[in-house]
């Protein structure tokens, strides 16, 4: 099938670039309406309106303050070289990725409070206070434990752009956040710090940690990718590469130092690091006719998926990069991709605002297994390692959305709970989730620990931590994951080819 390449229209500034114009026909409108009626649960149903909007950067508060600075500065300056960088570069880092901890004594659970005021052009806004009782429960909790962010980091300069990947989590417990041209690091032990990057006017568009947390890849809108060594105390840039156009996504292999880089021209660049060097080993040309928006590996590094602004999702086997194994065409751009960590061939694909669906595919046989209507742009999908569940984050919706994250059971596709948007400064329904990531940890024997938190980047310039898959309230969750299994619960059936589609579909219901 030949996909006609669409023209690109540009207006001043990258974030206002329009990559495609889509109009809904009457047939398309009816199709979306039918999906809503057929797939909405008996719970609270969402209403889908006609959408002529795009996925890229849809600002809703054009006249609001662009950079908010918290009144609280660091109480103590770090005695490291990194702490001198803001003075050298004339940067103001007060309040960036910072919070106050008002935990009560004798509290055993790790729940931080965000008791601060944010100074804006309209004055100080009301503070968000989460009190902690000695039994570890939230005393002023609105709804369940899961609905309240347990930590909020202020992130002035966080770009509201569907096509960027501003968060990365190291398996060593370090969070990297892209704020305009800079990269900030945060950990529970050392707090926030700024990386000593070369001065530039180009924004950071993507971040990615290697599976061991030893290397951090930083990409910018001008096509440069830097590989920073995080194994040494003195951060250093080991390698630097350039590509045509901006970079929206990158992904490290879970088993080695192989890095995928998605370009704006539709190419996927494959890099591999050895003990002495890192070099490009392959270029997969014209995988997509437009920008590559998402890249994702399966858990053993034998397959990866790519999603593009041309609505295409492609599957590659690592030992056969010349040819796509499968590809599927959708009705909107695809950024959200997630392989299941306990069902090797199960892939979740989240689409943009013109489709608003999550599709589930078998990447061994190429079949579509299920689909789920979400009612908004899907910006991320995350699988639990502890329970047979997944969650997804919501971006732009024509009607607005009150939810930031929604958790579902697999394969029942019934909702466990949703997390309402916790907006700062009264964003309300205009609040969007740009990206969400897990906080899993990996050990030397290739075993994983379930991350207690899901970290989300919101359009109100905050980074929030939600505790979703902890050990509390296990009765509301689905079955626990006891071992890695196939789609049918069998490794043998997982490896069989040419299983009839009807059998495949019925096998997961």
UniProtKB/Swiss-Prot annotation:
PROSITE patterns: WD_REPEATS_2 (PS50082), WD_REPEATS_REGION (PS50294). InterPro entries: Cdc20/Fizzy, WD40/YVTN_repeat-like_dom_sf, WD40_CDC20-Fz, WD40_repeat_dom_sf, WD40_rpt. It is found in: Nucleus. Coiled coil: none annotated. It comes from the Eukaryota. One of its GO terms (molecular function) is anaphase-promoting complex binding. One of its GO terms (biological process) is meiotic cell cycle. GO terms for cellular component: nucleus. WD repeats lie at residues 159-196, 199-238, 242-281, 287-326, 329-371, 437-477. Its main location: nucleus. Keywords: Meiosis, Nucleus, Repeat, WD repeat. Belongs to the WD repeat CDC20/Fizzy family. PANTHER family: CELL DIVISION CYCLE 20 CDC20 FIZZY -RELATED, MEIOSIS-SPECIFIC APC_C ACTIVATOR PROTEIN AMA1. Has a role in meiosis. This is Meiotic fizzy-related protein 2. It comes from Schizosaccharomyces pombe (strain 972 / ATCC 24843).
